[in-house]
Amino acid sequence: MKCNKCGATLTDSSFCNNCGANVKIYKKLISTSNALYNRGLEKAQVRDLSGARDDLKNSLKVYKRNIPARNLLGLVYFEMGDVVAALSEWIVSKNYQPEDNIADKYIEAVQNNVGKLDAYNMALKKYNQALLYARTGSLDLAVIQLKKVLSIHDKFVSAHLLLALVAIETNQIELARKELKKVLHID
């Protein structure tokens, strides 16, 4: 662990041996952030993506420069179908640690597959349109739009959830059940 003031390697002491700064609270922040990251990692490994997302976001609230937590949060967002949020996390990670950062590979992988990136963007636009239809009461149009979204991007958790909600509202209980099972499979 490095001192947040001078960058020197810290010891077990509550003070930096190099600059004399009190690092007791800083060490506690890092420890708490890492504990939340580890919990998020465990949840991600068993595909509890929503739980992992929450723990990783809390880890970053405690210490925003936790690069492994930020990169994993990006992966969780990507797995949940939120490519924009994933890219945002990886870009922030890259800005905090420009060298030796696996976020480079993630960003490159997404950007090199332009066709897939365009498909994700199209799915997001259609999802937003479906959301507008649902809010204005055009539930049949929302269902049509959401089915198009999911044909483009089948791991888009928010689209599955909105389709389930609209299906419940239109008394299509079997469709809602099917969509919720898909969400449970993804997350």
What are these regions (language model features)?
Residues K24, L60-K61, V92-N95, L150-S151, ...:
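Conserved structural position within tetratricopeptide repeats
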